[in-house]
């Protein structure tokens, strides 16, 4: 196996020694040692455990600083470790394609080491990495001017930080007469240099603080708004005979180690105070005077259990305005006692020290009454809906203002409403995507659609709605099949409901002749006459980051409300439709809560105060008015905050809310299996579950090994999911985003209205197509020539070079107002435009119909890839299926790693499938043996297909052999292109198949085999078709199609399995009794964004896990038909240990055919010489050094060289379609694209080229330095990617780079030596290139 760098120890990285992440063997031995090595190591590595390195291990520190090259099995090439002073530049690189992150000692903060505690209790505390360190520095960058604080303004040292107790609030007795205290001042100690190391997120969400029953508090509820059904914790009142005390905490109380690392966190804030400073000169004329907050000054500040008392100090006057659109970073949390405006006597309250992340201004927030119980910790993000006074203070209590915790976590209104019953169930709903299809839910959805259609029509009729109902049933025929219901029964149910729907529309739609219908809005407002004057939108997508909420509103309506005084008011309201009867009890509360939360969403979306909503129950034909009361909002927002906290705790610590412990409810819960398994994995038992034998039945079949596997992979999924949260934050709250271009979204897009808007009508639905183009560049930029951009490395961003692809789901958001408008699917994308398909017309909430087109075309748009809600929830669902009771077979293979079984006796039998394989002349011996391995497998088989060895052809013949046996087959891969490539070859063989997937994502050659193209009109037709077809194909994440709910297969074949993460691979395997994994784990591994997840094993595919555990299950394809001999020798020497061989003499001797050998340049003539199959163009004599375009790396000289070679190839008769260009960096790919704008050559990064090949491949390595240093940790040291780059060419491989720089990478040094053996190195001179 190719060499890997020797692992380095650090305060952040554990020293992993597990089967998932063991060291590789030297590349010179390569794949021939595969079987022996895994047989020797499988037992020992499978039992190893992860150990965490001591953050101050001196040995590790010395090891990091060492510059000695060590020759070990882990480091066979003697890779030198970098010295700290030499690696600074390398560490600052932000490579776009590399998953590698360089680690060295210089980037560690002193705060990561153990420090002596500052409190009087003695002992030591361990400094954790601060969750706010990086964000503080990011906030500092947004401050217009760096500002200095003098010693006079910062002279008081910060109070000693004390963790508050989870179990009780400690009171301290002090004399009261004549004593008044002021608000405690939080001023930092003398600043130190801020850490330069980016901080990883730590556990920033802790358990909720509950007062101990031992505390002498009187529980009171003095709500002035009346009783609310949404109960919140009561406030606490301090007895008058007890004096107030202060409890200051730097973290949430009661958390594991919170008191220690949160105190260290606060000390770290002191280090960065010189960055976050306030300059009086810059703020004299920008101050804003706000209404005074009701902060009482009769508070005595004291520190619990501490002999040091702090003197009363006042916060400085605010000199900077607080941006109302900013989020606040919580720096410190203190608990005190005092008098609030809504409470009598002394009561506890919290004070949050905040930092405005947009302006860098500090302020204070006071939480009273129910808000006192809010779980807030240093490092959390919050939003405050309210005003701060001139001193930067704000109160949140029963009567005033709101606190939104974790506003970037957008929680669905339906989730908040449902969480009152069981928070644990709601969190599981959020984290797991279930395959369940319920008839009741489906009928409700269909009735929703029919009712919404009636609302949208000007004159709805029974016949019209019945016709629409039939169309809706036809669209949902797959779901009907999954639920097992007949379309005739569903049609009958919908037809019966239509008269009631029309009756409601007739009574409540506004017209001069219609009768007045009154709606009861409750005791506060009473009955009001209501008429709907306009249906503004249906299924309106609404996100409100201000409140941390999102939702899809059934109908947004404009309503005319007539009062008793004959006055008329026009309002906008949400209309929520329920298909059942008006309930009572918990369900009624949930429905009301849902409508109330929708009023918040609409208030934010329409910039209006919306405080009423309508709730219509179809079966009971009852309409309720919902009037929003502050007491309800307080309870719901607190519940939303708790739920957001629960979701974040689950994603950071894998801890769920406690079980409900109610057998009557839990027995019927959809998550009973998952809930009990998680509880057991978290250390729970029968008694703590509260379910008795029911609990034991669901977990007794699992062992400690199983629970360890579950916890490990559950954590890895969450680590990877956290990386996606960064992009989610940009969608939810993009104010701080400065970049104009990102790989996962497009910015500065404008709607192209030159040809109007397109409509795509099918027999099932109408889609609206909107075409977007990049906003025109500025005039000055347009004058810059293409040559100028290439020479300077300065790129235009008009090209749509990103990760978005046809068929991807996307979110449309306005760039200026940051309004999320719609979601859709990419119908088409090119370098110049992107077309998005929507299910309804695109509209802006404030836009009038007459000006709709004009408003849309003048808006700037961002288009985000919507990849957050599906993949990770599917991964967790797949993972949990290994541990349910009926998952025994797949669990023993994947978790227990039991050896697979093979029926070798059948090879000699008269099986017609085996006879076919022996008789098929187009198969070589390797391919034949691989198919025989598949046919004899009882559990699973593994096919290791090296580059160009005909994996796809082998699978085609394997499918034909299995069909001869009468087997049913499920084909799957991670990408749509990989699935379609196989299906195209099956189609050429006349094999019938069913392709599951969206039309937009499927290749046009196989689109006719999609279910949507088959015009299935009945459940019976689906059953017949699925019984008839033997081959079904889907992506791994699309496997949850309703068509597969009741389907089982004999064999599942997964292509490109080496690139698929283990939890993703599990999904298709659940549908089959035997499976086949086809791949090559010596090429690209699964793409993992999180460094921590990758280091802990998430980059290890199921293919690799099983092949390392059981080499006997592998059948190797090593006869390749792609590369000529010279190119193949490179990969053999570096990766495969001479196991690859050419499949024929024609392949081995193939050369690039040129129509003419004439060339104006001698160096180009040498490069194009057909007998030179491998060429390395050395740029060391050209001073062709790398450049930086912001954080991206490119090389303008290499781009020019590539352009000249491509031009010469085309001039000499090589078709541009036979030429491919590969580079490790996106920025270089864009630069080369500008260098050859008129030549249609495929230019991609290495990751995008796996599975593709060309006659001639050019590789631009980019990296070139005047004084090169070791680059072992860079992208170029990733041997998987280098392997892919070298094995894409058929007849000629041309590499361009700096020999001096690349030689510092051990793997590339071997490559260059091998090229030198072939006399393939060509040194360019300064006069060789065109001027």
UniProtKB/Swiss-Prot annotation:
One of its GO terms (biological process) is DNA damage response. GO terms for cellular component: chromosome; nucleus. Its cofactor is [4Fe-4S] cluster. Residues 40-52 have a biased composition (Low complexity). InterPro entries: Dna2/JHS1_DEXXQ-box, DNA2/NAM7-like, DNA2/NAM7-like_C, DNA2/NAM7_AAA_11, DNA_replication_fac_Dna2_N, P-loop_NTPase, PDDEXK-like_dom_sf, SF1_C_Upf1. Residues 82-91 have a biased composition (Basic and acidic residues). Disruption phenotype: Defective embryo arrested at preglobular/early globular stage with the formation of giant endosperm nuclei. In jhs1, retarded growth, abnormal pattern of shoot apical meristem (SAM) cell division and differentiation, and morphological defects such as fasciation, irregular arrangement of siliques and phyllotaxy, and short roots. Increased sensitivity to DNA damage stress. Increased DNA damage response, including increased expression of genes involved in DNA damage repair and cell cycle regulation, and a higher frequency of homologous recombination. [4Fe-4S] cluster binds at residues 422, 666, 669, 675. GO terms for molecular function: 4 iron, 4 sulfur cluster binding; ATP binding; ATP hydrolysis activity; DNA binding; metal ion binding; nuclease activity; single-stranded DNA helicase activity. Residues 812-1331 are annotated as: Helicase activity. It catalyses: ATP + H2O = ADP + phosphate + H(+). Residues 924-1271 form the UvrD-like helicase ATP-binding domain. Residues 362-811 are annotated as: Nuclease activity. CDD domains: DEXXQc_DNA2, DNA2_N-like, SF1_C_Upf1. Residues 1-98 are annotated as: Disordered. Its main location: nucleus. PANTHER family: DNA REPLICATION ATP-DEPENDENT HELICASE_NUCLEASE DNA2, DNA2/NAM7 HELICASE FAMILY. Belongs to the DNA2/NAM7 helicase family. Essential protein required during embryogenesis. Key enzyme involved in DNA replication and damage repair, shoot apical meristem (SAM) maintenance, and development. Involved in Okazaki fragments processing. Possesses different enzymatic activities, such as single-stranded DNA (ssDNA)-dependent ATPase, 5'-3' helicase and endonuclease activities. This is DNA replication ATP-dependent helicase/nuclease JHS1. The gene is JHS1.
């Amino acid at each position: 196996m190719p060499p890997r760098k020797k692992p380095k120890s650090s305060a952040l990285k554990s020293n992993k020694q597990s089967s998932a992440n063991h060291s590789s063997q030297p590349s010179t031995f390569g794949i021939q040692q595969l079987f022996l090595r895994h047989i020797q190591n499988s037992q020992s590595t499978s039992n190893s455990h992860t150990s965490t390195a001591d953050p101050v291990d001196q040995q590790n520190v010395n090891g990091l600083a060492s510059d000695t090259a060590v020759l070990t099995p882990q480091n066979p090439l003697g890779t030198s470790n970098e010295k700290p002073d030499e690696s600074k530049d390398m560490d600052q690189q932000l490579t776009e394609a590399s998953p590698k992150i360089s680690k060295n000692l210089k980037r560690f903060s002193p705060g990561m080491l153990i420090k002596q505690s500052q409190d009087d209790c003695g002992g030591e505390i361990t400094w954790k990495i601060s969750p706010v360190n990086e964000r503080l520095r990011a906030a500092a960058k947004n401050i217009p001017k760096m500002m200095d604080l003098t010693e006079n303004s910062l002279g008081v040292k910060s109070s000693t930080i004390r963790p508050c107790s989870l179990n009780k609030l400690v009171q301290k007795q002090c004399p009261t007469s004549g004593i008044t205290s002021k608000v405690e001042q939080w001023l930092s100690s003398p600043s130190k240099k801020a850490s330069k190391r980016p901080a990883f997120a730590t556990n920033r969400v802790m358990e909720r603080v509950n007062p101990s029953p031992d505390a002498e508090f009187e529980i009171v509820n003095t709500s002035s708004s009346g009783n609310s059904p949404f109960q919140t914790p009561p406030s606490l009142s301090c007895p008058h005979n007890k004096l107030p005390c202060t409890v200051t905490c730097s973290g949430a109380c009661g958390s594991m180690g919170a008191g220690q690392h949160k105190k260290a966190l606060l000390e770290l804030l002191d280090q960065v105070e010189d960055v976050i400073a306030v300059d009086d000169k810059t703020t004299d004329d920008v101050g804003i005077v706000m209404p005074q907050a009701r902060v009482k000054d009769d508070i005595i500040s004291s520190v619990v259990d501490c002999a040091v008392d702090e003197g009363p100090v006042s916060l400085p006057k605010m000199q900077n305005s607080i941006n109302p659109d900013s989020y606040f970073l919580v720096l410190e949390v203190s608990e005190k006692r005092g008098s609030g405006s809504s409470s009598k006597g002394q009561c506890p309250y919290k004070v949050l020290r905040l930092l405005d992340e947009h302006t860098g201004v500090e302020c204070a927030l006071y939480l009273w009454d129910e808000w006192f119980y809010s779980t807030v910790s240093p490092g959390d993000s919050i939003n405050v809906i309210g005003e701060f006074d001139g001193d930067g203070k704000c109160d949140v209590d029963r009567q005033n203002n709101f606190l939104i915790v974790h506003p970037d976590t957008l929680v669905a209104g339906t989730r908040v409403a449902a969480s009152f019953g069981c928070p644990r169930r709601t969190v599981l709903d959020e984290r797991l995507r279930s395959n369940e299809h319920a008839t009741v839910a489906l009928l409700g959805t269909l009735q929703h659609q029919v009712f919404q259609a009636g609302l949208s029509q000007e004159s709805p009729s029974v016949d019209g709605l019945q016709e629409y109902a039939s169309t809706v049933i036809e669209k949902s025929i797959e779901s009907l099949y999954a639920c097992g219901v007949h379309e005739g029964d569903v049609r009958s149910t919908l037809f019966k409901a239509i008269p009631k729907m029309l009756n409601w529309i007739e009574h409540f739609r506004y017209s001069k002749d219609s009768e007045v219908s009154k709606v009861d809005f409750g005791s506060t407002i009473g009955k009001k006459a209501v008429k709907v004057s306009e249906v503004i939108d249906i299924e309106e997508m609404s996100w409100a980051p201000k409140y941390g909420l999102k939702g899809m509103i059934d109908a947004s309506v404009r309503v005319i409300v007539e009062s008793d005084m004959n006055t008329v008011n026009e309002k906008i309201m949400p209309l929520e439709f329920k298909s059942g009867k008006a309930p009572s009890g918990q369900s009624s509360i949930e429905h009301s809560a849902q409508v109330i939360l929708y009023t918040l969403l609409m208030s934010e979306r329409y910039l209006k105060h919306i405080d009423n909503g309508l709730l219509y129950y179809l079966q009971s034909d009852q309409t309720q008015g919902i009037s929003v009361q502050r007491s309800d909002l307080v309870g719901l927002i607190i519940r939303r905050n708790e739920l957001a906290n629960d979701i974040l705790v689950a994603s950071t610590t894998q801890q769920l809310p406690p079980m409900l412990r109610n057998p009557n409810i839990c027995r019927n819960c959809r998550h009973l299996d998952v809930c009990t398994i998680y509880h057991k994995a978290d250390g729970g038992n029968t008694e703590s579950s509260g379910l008795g034998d029911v609990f034991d039945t669901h977990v007794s079949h699992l062992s400690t090994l199983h629970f360890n596997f579950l916890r490990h992979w559950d954590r890895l999924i969450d680590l990877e999911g956290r990386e996606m949260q960064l992009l989610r934050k940009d969608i939810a709250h993009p104010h701080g985003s400065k970049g104009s271009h990102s790989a996962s979204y497009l910015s500065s897009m404008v709607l192209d209205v030159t040809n109007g808007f397109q409509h795509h009508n099918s027999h099932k639905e109408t889609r609206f197509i909107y075409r977007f183009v990049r906003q025109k560049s500025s005039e000055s930029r347009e004058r810059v020539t293409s040559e100028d951009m290439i020479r300077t490395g300065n790129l235009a961003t008009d090209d749509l070079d990103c990760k978005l692809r046809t068929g991807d789901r996307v979110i449309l958001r306005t760039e200026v107002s940051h309004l999320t408008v719609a979601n859709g699917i990419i119908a088409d994308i090119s370098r110049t435009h992107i077309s998005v398909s929507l299910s309804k017309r695109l509209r802006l909430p404030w836009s009038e119909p007459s000006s709709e087109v004009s408003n849309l075309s003048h808006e700037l748009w961002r288009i985000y890839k919507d990849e957050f809600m599906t993949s990770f929830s599917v991964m967790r669902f797949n993972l949990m299926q290994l541990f349910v009771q009926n998952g025994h077979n797949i669990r023993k293979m994947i978790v227990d790693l039991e050896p697979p079984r093979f029926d070798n006796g059948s090879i000699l039998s008269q099986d017609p499938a085996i006879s076919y394989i022996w008789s098929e002349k187009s198969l070589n011996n390797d391919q034949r043996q691989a198919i025989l391995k598949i046919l004899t497998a009882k559990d699973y088989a593994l096919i290791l297909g090296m580059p160009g060895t005909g994996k796809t052809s082998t699978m085609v013949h394997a499918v034909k052999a299995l069909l001869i046996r009468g087997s049913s087959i499920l084909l799957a891969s991670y990408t749509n292109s990989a699935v379609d490539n196989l299906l195209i070859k099956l189609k050429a063989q006349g094999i019938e198949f069913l392709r599951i997937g969206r039309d937009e994502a499927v290749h046009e050659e196989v689109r006719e085999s999609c279910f949507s193209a088959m015009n299935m009109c009945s459940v019976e037709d689906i059953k017949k078709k699925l019984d008839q077809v033997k081959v079904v194909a889907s992506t791994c994440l699309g496997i949850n199609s309703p068509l597969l709910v009741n389907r089982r297969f004999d064999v599942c074949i997964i292509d490109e399995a080496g690139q698929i993460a283990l939890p993703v691979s599990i999904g298709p395997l659940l549908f089959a009794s035997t499976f086949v994994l086809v791949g090559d784990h010596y090429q690209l591994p699964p793409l993992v964004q999180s460094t921590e997840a990758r280091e802990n094993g998430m980059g290890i595919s199921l293919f690799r896990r099983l092949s390392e555990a059981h080499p006997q299950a592998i059948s190797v394809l090593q006869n390749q038909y792609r590369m000529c001999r010279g190119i193949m020798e490179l990969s053999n020497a570096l990766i495969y240990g001479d196991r690859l061989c050419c499949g024929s003499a024609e392949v081995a001797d193939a050369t690039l055919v040129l129509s003419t050998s004439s060339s104006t340049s001698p160096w180009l003539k040498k490069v194009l010489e057909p007998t030179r199959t491998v060429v390395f163009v050395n740029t060391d004599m050209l001073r062709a050094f790398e450049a930086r375009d912001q954080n991206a790396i490119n090389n303008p000289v290499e781009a020019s060289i590539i352009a000249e070679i491509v031009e010469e190839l085309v001039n000499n008769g090589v078709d541009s379609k036979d030429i491919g260009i590969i580079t490790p960096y996106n920025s270089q790919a864009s630069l080369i694209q500008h260098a050859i704008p008129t030549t249609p050559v495929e230019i991609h990064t290495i990751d995008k080229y796996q599975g593709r090949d060309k006659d001639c491949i050019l590789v631009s390595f980019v990296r070139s330095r005047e004084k090169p240093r070791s680059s072992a940790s860079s992208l170029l040291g990733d041997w998987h990617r280098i392997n892919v780059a070298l094995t894409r060419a058929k007849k000629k491989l041309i590499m361009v780079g700096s020999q001096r720089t690349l030689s510092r990478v051990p793997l590339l040094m071997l490559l260059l030596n091998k090229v030198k053996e072939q006399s393939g190195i060509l040194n360019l001179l300064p006069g060789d290139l065109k001027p």
